[in-house]
Amino acid sequence: MIPKDPMILFSFINTRLRDSQLSLEELCSELDIDRVDLEEKLRAVGFEYDIALNRFC
């Protein structure tokens, strides 16, 4: 289960991306979540995924 609060979700996803060294696509698959939905939730609070950095910022 992933956090519902967008700020906690932001921190959770970035931590998992950093610690696991997975791509966003791989992490979403591992967590069984929709990548587009995740990106929309975080975009709504001002965060965009940076593929070069492999994190939301």
PLM regions with names:
Residues 1-23:
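N-terminal acidic leader/helix
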Residues 34-48:
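Short acidic, Pro/Gly- and aromatic-enriched capping/linker segments at domain boundaries
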Residues 27-28:
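Short alpha-helical "recognition helix" segments of helix-turn-helix
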Residues 51:
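Short, acidic, Ser/Thr-enriched surface-loop or helix-capping motifs
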